[in-house]
């Protein structure tokens, strides 16, 4: 792996690779045009991925307050909930209310996870900016997650694409296809490069706007990140935008993010206080911590557009409703060093 100094230079050289410019991508009016895009784009997933696996229901008001604070910190994309049946994931029984509130924030793109075309139709009707659809590279994990084969889920993605295309051009949300267990599976073990590329190819052929590679159970290493990203780029071509969704299960989350930067990735998912995990992946717990990721990137000279002081305020909201054992983050323990220049 290249040194951090080299990575910093590489970040500037590859700045345009994989960036979306929001004025052309998201149709919902924004409060003000961006002066320039940040070097690295972070999607905050705590309101959805961070809460879905909790065995306690977080009050609707708290979810809305969390989203408010995240948006106020300058985060430009928020995964705000999932349009799934409440009996499957009770945490999102209030998704319609939460999503309506989230969409009042014009400075951020608001996205939602959907498991099928019915969920997509609800998300489209709600007016979301982005729809996230997951297919596992692992057949076993896909069956556990959505009770469908990989082939059946690919057909489901095509149906979602068709539902979006049926809307007027100005009312079509962006569609991201996420490949779960891209770097290993707690149910199957190793996941082959071919299995990941198969799903990536299906997403590209169905005209996904973006493809996400998810380290669902935190088994990735920096070397493996580079290998899989390179393989997927060969499969779908350099014009496809890729993002990484990393977990810190085994402590390699930030190292894997640096490997992603070296591989040309400029879009990452993360969760405040490291919330999250997959309810159908035994042993998986904890997305990479947004606060720690922002600090690292800014220290590397890569802008995120996020006000770290404001982002840290999310901990107070979470601590009122979520047990401390679920809340992590080095920056919360050590505090923000004076050397960090504000990203605001």
Language model segments and positions:
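Catalytic cores and adjacent flexible loops of soluble metabolic enzymes
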Residues: 20-344
